[in-house]
Amino acid sequence: MASYTVKLITPDGENSIECSDDTYILDAAEEAGLDLPYSCRAGACSTCAGKITAGSVDQSDQSFLDDDQIEAGYVLTCVAYPTSDCTIETHKEEDLY
């Protein structure tokens, strides 16, 4: 099991957390004491949306984002596993619309 450093850029500042490659980023953030937005926890809405600015994730469990949004770097943190060290700007739901 690999572990990666995930930098989360929130409206309140930056936080770096450790996240294993079999843990969703939202879950790891909550375990680290961070309060990120979420609703369905199933990849079927956009409440937890973020934008990845460096690195990569596996969000194959998501069913909400279209191909253009994924190509633009949007990620649903509730169903995203890190596949490298990465940086994600959180609280991006409004940017999707």
From Swiss-Prot:
InterPro entries: 2Fe-2S_ferredoxin-like_sf, 2Fe-2S_ferredoxin-type, 2Fe2S_fd_BS, Beta-grasp_dom_sf, Fd_pln. Keywords: 2Fe-2S, Electron transport, Iron, Iron-sulfur, Metal-binding, Transport. Binds 1 [2Fe-2S] cluster. [2Fe-2S] cluster binds at C40, C45, C48, C78. The keyword Coiled coil does not apply. One of its GO terms (molecular function) is 2 iron, 2 sulfur cluster binding. Residues 4-94 form the 2Fe-2S ferredoxin-type domain. One of its GO terms (biological process) is electron transport chain. Its cofactor is [2Fe-2S] cluster. The keyword Iron applies. Belongs to the 2Fe2S plant-type ferredoxin family. Ferredoxins are iron-sulfur proteins that transfer electrons in a wide variety of metabolic reactions. This is Ferredoxin. It comes from Synechocystis sp. (strain PCC 6714). The lineage of its organism: Bacteria, Bacillati, Cyanobacteriota, Cyanophyceae, Synechococcales.
